[in-house]
Amino acid sequence: MAIKSVLYDKYKKDVTKSLMKEFNYKSTMEIPRLEKIVINSGLGDATSDSKIVEIGLKELHLITGQKPIATKSKKSIATFKLREGQAIGAKVTLRRENMWNFLTKLISIAIPRIRDFRGLSTKSFDGNGNYTFGIKEQIIFPEIVYDDVKKLRGFDITIVTSAKTDKEAMFLLKELGMPFVKTKEAK
């Protein structure tokens, strides 16, 4: 039996009700939900040292608890010393329990550890209800031991929702506890 996330319980009990009230959905099937979270890390130094890809894969595995895949270049570019098919990044797609557990850890532990954090930008929605933001350092996650890190690397996190508009997706993520930048309202 899988362990249910606290955030998933909050979504089922509280967030669905507030979404129904806010957007006047006729059916519970219209309520936006999280579909997946994709974490992508570009390892630019991997062209010179192949061990960097292994380190990047290991770090993503520690952070997410799921085995990532190596992303490969599509074509050769001589100026970047890049060959076709060479591993240049790492990617992992989280769904179901792994997704909810990662989001809980991201919101409650990792994001508060970001230096000089003032909130996530509200302008990073793609127009289809998906939200993407970047993390500059992997050390904000508790699984990464600072002394073992040779180089600080960042990665992109994309939260894919079933929301039709950015407004619905933003309301969903706000209700789940995502710390967005406070906008200045007219007095």
UniProtKB/Swiss-Prot annotation:
InterPro entries assigned: Ribosomal_uL5 (IPR002132), Ribosomal_uL5_bac-type (IPR020930), Ribosomal_uL5_C (IPR031309), Ribosomal_uL5_CS (IPR020929), Ribosomal_uL5_dom_sf (IPR022803), Ribosomal_uL5_N (IPR031310)
Keywords for the protein's UniProt record, in alphabetical order: Ribonucleoprotein, Ribosomal protein, RNA-binding, rRNA-binding, tRNA-binding
GO MF annotation: an example: tRNA binding
One GO process term, biological-process aspect: translation
Subunit structure: Part of the 50S ribosomal subunit; part of the 5S rRNA/L5/L18/L25 subcomplex. Contacts the 5S rRNA and the P site tRNA. Forms a bridge to the 30S subunit in the 70S ribosome.
Family classification: Belongs to the universal ribosomal protein uL5 family.
HAMAP family with a match to the protein in the record: Ribosomal_uL5_B (MF_01333_B)
Described function: This is one of the proteins that bind and probably mediate the attachment of the 5S RNA into the large ribosomal subunit, where it forms part of the central protuberance. In the 70S ribosome it contacts protein S13 of the 30S subunit (bridge B1b), connecting the 2 subunits; this bridge is implicated in subunit movement. Contacts the P site tRNA; the 5S rRNA and some of its associated proteins might help stabilize positioning of ribosome-bound tRNAs.
The protein, known as: Large ribosomal subunit protein uL5
Protein species of origin: Malacoplasma penetrans (strain HF-2)
